Amino acid sequence: MSHTPKSAGSSHAPANSQTALVIGAIGVVFGDIGTSPLYTLKEAFSPHYGLTPDHDTVLGILSLVFWALMLVVTLKYVTVIMRADNDGEGGIMALTALAQRTLPGGSRSMYVVGILGIFGASLFFGDGVITPAISVLSAVEGLEVAAPRLEPFVVPITLVVLGMLFLAQRFGTERVGKAFGPITLLWFFALGAIGVYNMARAPEVLHALNPWWGVRFFAQHNWHAVFVLGAVVLAVTGGEALYADMGHFGAKAIRRSWQFVVLPMLTLTYLGQGALMLRNPAAVSNPFYEAVPEWALYPMIVLATAATVIASQALITGAYSVASQAMQLGYIPRMHIRHTSHSTIGQIYVPAVNWCLLALVAVAVIGFGDSASLATAYGVSVTGTMLITTVLMIIYARANPRVPAPLLWLFALVFLAVDCAFFYANIIKFLDGAWFPLLLGLILFTLMRTWRRGRKLLHDEIRKDGIKLDTFLPGLMLAPPVRVPGTAVFLTADPMVVPHALMHNLKHNKVLHERNVFLTVETLQVPYAAAGKRLKIDAIGDEFYRVHVRFGFMETPDVPLALMRSCDQGGIYFDPMDTTYFASRETIVASANRGMPIWRDKLFALMHRNAAPATGFFRIPGNRLVELGAQVEI
């Protein structure tokens, strides 16, 4: 997951490189949607929906599944949404940044778009809990078909598989990741082969490709058909990954993978399961494994487990990536990030995210107990994210003069209707399990909003009580303190105000360094900062400098490296072994009389206290950093 957008997406890449990207995309991007056949039709015919697997109902459900894949994935994501790239990057955070750029800065509408983006990212993490749980559990449930006596061991085996997966994250996926594409490719061909095997025995199932059967299903079942969409949407879960991983593999490779491999194989496997149910209605108990020939059952269970582990791995890696972006954009506190590859910057491991996901996934597996129960909880976070993506796309496209207004309104009407129908079909299952991912999303949304608001209040308080740098320095130099050799770098969020760390240094040590740099780090709403805009240096006299460093939200801030570059661009003498970094470490004091409600003030104080220090986040050597404390009331 490390290709830069330009290399990944280049249309002039060599054929062997494009083939590698296609296979890589199949392994990472399509793992989630590729494991949906394990449980989609099983859920559609579960007692929860009260459907009987007669001829018309089977064809109706199959038609809805096929056209959901065509409308939501092929038309919406592959054809339209993937055109909205933020310098090659996709995903809901990137689309939020694009939509905000079309709105007046500081406006109410820009604020609302930011809220939508945060909530969409929060729902993504809810999806990140359900996907590994339901995928691996569905695969292991094949043991119930092969040997019913093993049913009591399904949950323990699932927990062991998931535990090993999360424990292995710290070692990175660089080596095993190379096998993801071929294994998932084998999985898709196995899906297609099983589909053809069963379709040959009931070729009339091909009639389901006619949308008339889907329309007929709605005509026969009225509002109950909308309710059934809660199961149909399981077929398109993972569609968001096509857009989210666009920066890693490029739009071209993802489109080719979908058109020539994934869509045909998914269509064949769903039709194959439908053909089986037409011949044997009792197969609805687990149509995926019932469709597998008896001799291939155990190998298929192993392959399915491998495919679901790969799907889970892709989502876990995506969670790390989104968390890293959210940190860079200031939505969540800094956390320790480990780079698991010497050659690939994008391969990271975030321990806090990993252990939180493991705990929540284990709770989901134990609490729900089987894939049928988890399926009722699954769709709401996915459909919520899809709906928010559509709204953000409409806002972004509105400002694009190349998009004709009639085409935009057609897109809005069709996909708002589709997404709202899917979301409604899942939200009405609130008491049956949909509350779980919504609760997770709401908790994360509250944390992100509290952190964002708390940081602004903290910045405002520091600025209010601060002294203007331009008036402080001339007064200081009237009676200059003793200057000692070396360079002092003061990290500051506001380059116009005297940093607390400088004031403390003067108060307690009564010295100034030979050179003093006021360094501000800014994260842009683009994935990668352009070379010409990365660094800005202002010399303000007497060996004082303002240095403004910009990073994209996909980059890892490296302050020492930025200062090395400042030697060439701004003439600042910089010796890493002769430089001391100073940072303020504020202690938050919650107050009931200002800012946020007292409970949010206390929550922010707790988050701030547990945030990772700047040392690791900005790649500052620990033996070169001095942190000075300050109390701030918010």
Swiss-Prot record:
Catalytic activity: K(+)(in) + H(+)(in) = K(+)(out) + H(+)(out)
GO CC list: plasma membrane
InterPro entries documented for this protein: K+_transporter, K_trans_C, K_trans_N, Kup
Transmembrane parts of this sequence: 21-41, 58-78, 110-130, 152-172, 179-199, 223-243, 258-278, 296-316, 348-368, 377-397, 403-423, 427-447
Keyword Ion transport among record annotations: yes
Keyword Membrane included in the entry's annotation: yes
Keywords: Cell inner membrane, Cell membrane, Ion transport, Membrane, Potassium, Potassium transport, Symport, Transmembrane, Transmembrane helix, Transport
Domain of life: Bacteria
Membrane topology, from the record: Multi-pass membrane protein
Main localization of the protein described in the UniProt heading: membrane
UniProt subcellular location: Cell inner membrane
Similarity comment text for this entry: Belongs to the HAK/KUP transporter (TC 2.A.72) family.
Described purpose of this protein according to its UniProt entry: Transport of potassium into the cell. Likely operates as a K(+):H(+) symporter.
Listed name of the protein: Probable potassium transport system protein Kup
Lineage: Bacteria, Pseudomonadati, Pseudomonadota, Gammaproteobacteria, Lysobacterales
Gene: kup
